Amino acid sequence: MKKIIVLLLLSPIFITAQVASVDFFVINDGMEEEYLEMEKVWVEFHKQMIAEGKMYGWSLFKVVSTSIEEGDSPDYMTLNRFESIEAMEAMWSDMNYEKFLKIVKKRVKGKLSTRKIKKIVEAKVKKSHHSYVIEMTDQTVPSVEMEVGEFIQVDAMIQQVDDYEGYETNIAQPILQRTVNDGNLKWWGLTKVSNRNDQALKEITHFTWQIPIEGKEMDWWSEKSSSIFGGEFAYGKLANLVGESRKVLGSGKLQLIMSEK
């Protein structure tokens, strides 16, 4: 039950949940089919937890592309959404392997034996597993729902100054909100990392998330953007401060392929 040990966030992908566990998986070569079979078993467990009000939702994303040039890049990401840290911890503290098997067995209604379920979930399909607990610190409005097939852009950030979140909230967010209002972006969110498993990258302090609109583009340097802060000169200085406040460790484009809420 390694997945139970440490778990992440986002909307109705983050929006109704303030806490989430996000898990990035590198899948062993040739075992993608077995991994997806495993998630189809796990989703039955998540459906039950959602029905009982113990979590807000669960989503599975396929990593389409990343900026990672060295080492393994993740193949999939799962997002588990909760009302609070306490709710997340309470759900997992009351769970064990036998309870998990019983829940799944009941939900599949005889389609899978306990032996088959165990074989699927115990298969060694994951080469690595980076898990982060994240908390929402800022976002655009209104709240949104992602549809299966849509894409999301994820950026892993390393905070460089103490008031990094203030730069995102007071400079980046107003521009992103205007972009949402103009119909050129669906949603943006900023989350901070509050916990992680041993395999997770220790440098990462935050993630930013953007849900694009097909055929639309983000224009950071438009006249509309600079006018928010009094003109091109002032905006350029502020933009430099934002850039210096964090380092982008890596970026990825992900596609939503399964979702329960």
Describe the predicted segments one by one.
Residues 17-102, 111-261:
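Short S/T/G/P-rich N-terminal loop/turn motif that feeds into the first structured element of a domain
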Residues 2-16:
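Sec-dependent N-terminal signal peptides
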